[in-house]
Amino acid sequence: MKSGVTTVVDAGTTGALDIGKFYEDTKKYKTNVYALINIAKQGITSQDELSSMMNIDEYELKRAVKKYKDFVVGIKARMSKSVVISNDVEPLKVAKRIKNELNLPMMVHFGSSPPTIEDIFDYMEKGDILTHIYNGKPNGILRGNEVKKEIIEARERGIILDVGHGTESFSMDIAMKSKDAGIFPDTISTDIYIKNRINGPVYNLSTTMEKFIYMGYSLEDIIDKVTKNAADAISLKNKGLIKEGYDADLTIFDVVNEEKELQDSLNKSVITSTSIKPRAVVVNGEYLNIGKSIGENE
């Protein structure tokens, strides 16, 4: 909230065994918090949470979703070699069946292969979310300098493309090539945690938004991608719009002309002339100052 974000969604840190503790921890904050539950029962206690299929406990997963139905907004499956080891797409097959039984959206993380992005798409459906789309790894959205036809087909099938910046998952060059090809992200997200919040390259949502301004996206389009589109992707019916009947969650910010260095996950740096400075938020109807307005000493 202090960085101008009124609602956050944790993308799979916890699984069925520890999501209850996470839920209780969120109650101490004014920020609205929701979660995608990891299909691995232990969540991300290590980077290879799906190296054993025994880590998927369908009964406990469904029980946790039912118990925390107003908190869990979808399920998360991390599909990269370091996570699944030798299991390839087998965890994703299970995740697809479970998410259909629960009628929840599914977010899929992809990185190094196997599984390949082509194989991953075989188990994704309309309304599912692919994150880290600009990750810069060989198993990415480009084939040479062209966007893979599978990505174009996925968009046509209604699969949601999410940025998921993260420490290692955002290449500005790939993002620009994708934009030039007419393939745009549906949602812009940070994949933020303590390391990339303090040391970069993420820092906060505003900085991620500034990168898309630098790449030529309009501020209005960017705002849609971090508000309305994001809320729609996980069916948060009362979020994402300034409209009667919606929650009174707002961010007040200044857009100022000043030079600032921006860095992607591959150490590419650019200088932008546009900076977003959150000044205040309204969370559940409560107004809170978080910064100084234009004209005041910074």
Question: Where are each of the predicted segments found?
Answer:
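Divalent-metal coordination cores built from histidine and acidic residues
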Residues: M1-S80
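C-terminal cap of metal-dependent C-N hydrolases
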Residues: D247-N297
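Divalent metal-coordination and catalytic microenvironments
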Residues: G4, F22, I75, L130, ...
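His/Asp/Glu-enriched, well-ordered alpha-helical/loop segment
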Residues: D173-V255
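Short acidic, glycine/serine/threonine-rich loops at helix termini
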Residues: K21-F22, T45-S51, N87-V89, I117-F121, ...
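Residues at the N-termini of beta-strands
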Residues: T6-T7, G74, I129, T187, ...
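Active-site core of metal-dependent hydrolases
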Residues: A77-K177, G182-N199
